[in-house]
Regions:
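Short, amphipathic alpha-helical interaction segments positioned at domain boundaries
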Residues: 428-453
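Minor-groove-contacting beta-hairpin "wing" of winged helix-turn-helix DNA-binding domains
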Residues: 420-424
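Local cysteine-cluster metal-coordination motifs and their immediate loop/turn environment
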Residues: 54-70
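Amphipathic alpha-helical substructures
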Residues: 398-399
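Basic amphipathic alpha-helical segments that dock to polyanions
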Residues: 386, 403-411
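C-terminal scaffold of the Radical SAM
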Residues: 42, 49, 73-94, 102-395, ...
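A short, conserved structural fragment
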Residues: 409-419
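Flexible, acidic/Gly-rich N-terminal and inter-domain linker regions that tether
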Residues: 1-50
Length: 453
């Protein structure tokens, strides 16, 4: 059965969440520090494992496609007050968790974490290790920009206990790079990866984006071939969402230079077929991995999870978000820090955590979240297990979803019976659409998301 079915894609391609959480972050609302502390207390009593996410917002230059929370500056001195504030937040957060809780994952994202010097990264990592209880052989990853990195900085990352790197490439074509203000050569990227492998980094991940200005199937073929030469363990292939009304840098992208919808689909189709032909496993949505990568193994073993950093091998971890705009998932809650750097500083100077909004999951949220995560990660839901876990009857609980599900079954996207809901091969690229059937929040927020393909 074909994975790529153009007729189905054209019929179902609409805006929808990436489901790095459920409910999605744009449903967060007022959330008190007292509520957060109740959730950290619950996490401690459960002895939940911890994943630390640390946001470094600074970038030397602006990439026009980017929708991340960032501060564009070449002034390296701005890192010092930010780190001082971050250290305060780390101290405050660490007091809310039990010392027996183990940190199994750590991720530095941005912005550009390698805006910091090697010494600053080591100091920040040491601070986290002093504040929390780290697993000896955990997964510790960092996003890097090859344009401003050298051998010494890679060695500093290794000293700081990082063992995985994520590199934003997006496209190796020079014309595309100029159009998005991110010129980065293949040789720069290869050099950094080679140094990382010499320093025993166990995994390299590369991010690509399809749908960028001046991009075509023919140009992107060459990018894919170069990426395959680098042979990263993981590849993320994101759909560019042009939302200039929300993301100011995107206003510098000429609308007429974007590939038309048909060409964009051709780029995606070829990319999908090429990567699978080169031995990569399609994990789901926007991720590919080599067969021996922990992501691929976790999917086979039924242990795959999805969070704000994408797919993950640690489903049991609570996420502690640190830094401006970072998002956490602790016990039965989601929370997000202040997005504005000034307000982030003010909160910490006043002696309280900079949490600005969040959400406590109700019973319905938990049921739908569990179902959506199973679909996103494993393309199948064991209905009887879900019913037993939450004391529900699937057919009656999701009665309002049945008409859409039956239509999807008629179209060959899914197979539904008393035992399971399974996403079929031709429906895997449209798994977000299947999840959207169960999303009770979607009718209020659909216009703010990217297309599902």
């Amino acid at each position: 059965m074909r994975l790529f079915d153009i007729d189905l894609i054209n019929r179902y391609n609409r805006s929808g969440p990436r489901y790095t959480s459920y409910p999605s972050a744009n449903n967060f609302s007022e959330f008190s520090l007292e509520e957060y502390e109740q959730q950290t207390d619950l996490s401690s009593r459960r002895r939940s494992s911890i994943s630390l996410y640390c946001h470094i917002p600074f970038c030397n230059t602006v990439c026009y496609y980017c929708g991340c929370n960032k501060v564009v500056t070449k002034d390296k001195a701005k890192a010092k007050p930010y780190l001082d504030a971050l250290y305060k937040e780390i101290d405050m957060q660490s007091l809310l968790f039990d010392k027996t809780q183990i940190v199994k994952q750590m991720h530095f994202g941005g912005g550009t974490p390698t805006f910091l010097s090697g010494e600053q990264i080591i100091q920040l990592s040491n601070k986290l290790q002093q504040a929390f209880n780290f697993e000896l052989n955990g997964e510790y990853s960092i996003e890097i920009d090859p344009r401003g990195i050298d051998k010494n900085l890679i060695e500093s990352l290794a000293i700081a206990r990082f063992n995985r790197i994520s590199i934003g490439v997006q496209d190796f074509d020079f014309e595309v790079q100029k159009a998005v203000n991110r010129v980065q050569s293949f040789n720069q990227t290869k050099k950094v990866i080679d140094i990382a492998r010499v320093n025993d980094f166990s995994s390299v991940s590369i991010d690509l984006i399809y749908g960028l200005p001046r991009q075509s199937k023919d140009t992107f073929i060459k990018t894919l071939e170069k990426v395959n030469d680098l042979r990263p363990e993981r590849i993320s292939l994101f759909n560019y969402a042009h939302l200039p009304e929300r993301f100011k840098p995107q206003r510098r992208i000429a609308l007429e230079e974007l590939p038309n919808p048909a060409e964009k689909l051709r780029i995606f189709q070829y990319s999908l077929e090429y990567l699978i032909a080169q031995g990569y496993i399609y994990i789901g949505m926007d991720h590919f991995a080599l067969p021996d990568d922990p992501l691929a193994i976790a999917q086979i073993e039924g242990n795959l999870h999805r969070n704000f950093q994408g797919y993950s091998t640690h489903s049991e971890c609570d996420i502690v978000g640190l830094g401006v705009s970072s998002i956490g998932h602790v016990a039965d809650s989601y929370s997000q820090n202040e997005k504005d750097l000034k307000r982030y500083y003010q909160a910490l100077e006043s002696g309280h955590l900079p949490i600005s909004k969040g959400l406590i999951l109700n019973t319905d949220d938990k049921i739908r979240r569990a179902l959506i995560m199973e679909l996103i990660c494993h393309f199948e839901v064991n209905i009887q297990r879900l019913e037993k876990r939450f004391s529900i009857r699937f057919i009656s609980y999701f009665e309002e979803c049945l008409l859409e599900l039956l239509q999807m079954q008629s179209d060959g996207l899914i197979k539904l019976n008393n035992e399971s809901l399974k996403v079929m091969e031709r429906g895997k690229l449209l798994v977000r659409n299947v999840c959207m059937v169960f999303d009770t929040y979607l009718k209020f927020t659909e216009e703010s998301f990217s297309k599902t393909i």
